[in-house]
Curated annotation (Swiss-Prot):
It comes from African swine fever virus (isolate Tick/Malawi/Lil 20-1/1983). Transmembrane segments: none annotated. Coiled coil: none annotated. This is Protein MGF 360-6L. Plays a role in virus cell tropism, and may be required for efficient virus replication in macrophages. Disulfide bonds: none annotated. One of its GO terms (biological process) is taxis. Belongs to the asfivirus MGF 360 family.
Length: 375
């Protein structure tokens, strides 16, 4: 049962009773747990967002209700915990972050499953991933060493690898990452992959030391919106050829490859990088050529103007028996640049239009040429 004090706070906050306050009121509001970040606490019932002062629901610093609960639990703010649960927050998120025994007891009294810490950790991790709740996941796991340590080592890394290959997470890392850093990068990567603007901006602001890695991740995943934002609005710069080498490694990454090309990367160097990678996979006796995605990158680089008739590239293209169409195109001299890609455009929306048009026409362009040459 909620106290009269909690219910009173609920009514006052929902009716924005503290929208106009005097500086002398700040201390009192803080003592009454009616202060959030830099202003009086606010709550939007429609968006389920907790705000501060004049902050809007869409503000990068506004909190989803479950995130607000986690923060209140970490600070042992009893009335706010009760209030957020009253508004509909999931108390199981709270018990994971409770550091004091009395706070854990309160969470259980409010409906948390006392066995959740033993049986619910992996399920929650996967559920947060499915729902793309990046910021909530970071609030729960980042710097929550007891919880991270409670994961079985093998299962923890298997979980990360199951959802995502760890290769890109280790860019810029010279030694094995701590679980803490790995979790942070993992969820940051999810935000970039799905272009979750608010989480990206929030994490960029909070973790500026990851700026270069963020740009590399955006290139690798072909997120042209984030590449454009980092490159032109934040002035985060990397060598375009280095960026291109990352773009080429992600299957069917036309957006990333094109954007690096438009920034000035050498497209012949990109094709050579792909060929070296393909040959490396052959040496390791991995059946990599069945991977259409990487061969799609090869074809796209050629469409951008890369020269496929260099000896080393010829040998690779002719040796690959599984890529019959690519081999046939090569023998007939049909691997040429595509006219629609001649312009170098950097505005993300226009880039997507160009790639969309290219994808619509490339098959007809190639097979039409093949038909004419085989007559």
């Amino acid at each position: 049962m909620n106290s009269l004090q909690v219910l009173t706070k609920k009514v006052l906050i929902e009716n924005k009773a503290f929208s106009n306050y005097h500086e002398d009121d700040v201390f009192i509001l803080q003592q009454l747990e009616l202060w959030w970040e830099n202003g009086p606490i606010g709550f939007c019932k429609q968006c389920k967002m907790v705000t501060s002062g004049s902050m809007s629901c869409s503000d990068v610093d506004s909190y989803e209700l479950d995130r607000a609960l986690v923060k209140a639990v970490k600070k042992n703010q009893t009335d706010l915990i009760k209030l957020f649960v009253l508004w509909g927050a999931n108390i199981n998120y709270g018990i994971i972050c409770a550091k004091m025994e009395r706070t854990k007891v309160l969470c259980i009294q409010l409906g948390a499953d006392p066995t959740f810490l033993e049986v619910g950790l992996y399920t929650m991790f996967v559920d947060l991933f499915k729902q793309q709740k990046v910021l909530l996941a970071i609030d729960i796991y980042y710097e929550n060493i007891p919880i991270l340590d409670s994961f079985d080592s093998h299962d923890f890394y298997a979980l990360i690898n199951f959802i995502y290959n760890r290769y890109i997470l280790y860019l810029d890392e010279k030694e094995e990452m701590t679980r803490n850093t790995l979790v942070l990068k993992f969820w940051f990567k999810i935000a970039i992959e799905f272009n979750l603007i608010k989480p990206i901006r929030f994490l960029s602001k909070k973790f500026p030391h990851l700026d270069d890695w963020r740009l590399k991740m955006a290139v690798y995943l072909g997120n042209v919106d984030e590449i454009h934002h980092a490159y032109f609005q934040e002035n985060i710069r990397l060598d375009p050829n280095h960026m291109m080498s990352l773009a080429c490694m992600y299957p069917q990454n036309k957006l990333g490859i094109y954007y690096c090309f438009a920034l000035g990367a050498n497209i012949n160097t990109a094709l050579e990088t792909l060929i070296r990678f393909i040959n490396h996979e052959v040496d390791r006796e991995i059946t990599f050529f069945s991977n259409y995605g990487i061969w799609s990158n090869v074809h796209f680089c050629i469409s951008l103007g890369a020269n496929p008739y260099i000896k080393k590239i010829q040998e690779t293209l002719l040796r690959e028996e599984k890529n019959v169409i690519m081999k046939l195109f090569f023998k007939k001299g049909l691997l040429t640049s595509h006219s629609i890609l001649h312009k170098k455009i950097l505005e993300p929306g226009e880039v997507r239009k160009i790639i969309s048009t290219y994808e619509y026409t490339e098959t007809f362009h190639s097979f039409s040429s093949l038909r004419d040459n085989l007559r």
